[in-house]
Amino acid sequence: MLNDIQKSILQTVSDMVSIPDGAVNIRLDGQKEFRQNSEHIQIVSKTDKNGIDIRIAPFTKSENVHIPVILSKSGFHDLVYNDFFVGEGADVTIVAGCGIHNCGDCDSEHDGIHTFYIGKNAKVHYIEKHYGEGEGSGKRILNPQTIVYLEEGASIVMDTSQIGGVDDTKRYTKCEANGANSEVQINEKLLTAGDQHAVSEMDVILNGEGSRTRVVSRSVAKEASTQIFYPRVQGNAPCFGHVSCDSIIMGAAKVRSIPEISCNHVDAALMHEAAIGKIAGEQLLKLETLGLTPEEAEEKILEGFLR
């Protein structure tokens, strides 16, 4: 039974107010709190290490998988390995948020390592929200790793966001588009404040003929926080890739964006762009003339930027 704080975190990171249809696995402080399988999706605990295997039957359509994680014990360190086996022709949405509540003096940390094996012509929409809260001096640390292997015609859309309260994060994403006409789309949103620190590293490797990727990273760095981005795309076949990184910097924050594209085939077409800057004064002025305070105008602009 979840307490009120745990329920609030669950809703924040997964939009769950009750148990939804489909497969569900709720992890609380390193233990299985709740599990539900569906006819076409089975969740099984690993026997050799912490984590679960999620097996999605071929041609499963319009089903959801929720696997949220909650940490509510100060000083707790959680390492988990989750493997997803997505059958041919399946079309599913996977929600995998993580929230930490830390009111103590010791650091709390969750390291989630997710590996996807996406079958021929299968489609995956992966949604991941990270959030931290608590008045204690202990840090809230999240270090996710996401590894994806795509077969012919397979695709994944990854919507990942860090919506606040995470003191330290090191994010790593690796996608191998091995099959012909496979596709990777990554939409990353990141917010830091105070003295928080975030590193995001991505490798998208386009091996399949006609494979393609679009990587979009948007971030806001406030106060004295720091962010570093390393989005890398490698084209080893006739393929297309585009990387776009945009950051808003405020106060004494620091942001580094270091995109890299590598073409290893004459018919690989790759491009990147990066922009870092403050909120334009005319944007604030326009909203202030509509009756907003400077603080309200600033928040409205940031909200739209990270939407």
Feature annotation, model-predicted:
Residues 1-26:
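C-terminal functional modules
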Residues 297-298:
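Small-residue helix-packing motif on alpha-helices
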Residues 20, 25-27, 33-285, 289-292, ...:
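Conserved beta-strand/loop scaffold segments within soluble protein domains that form the structured core
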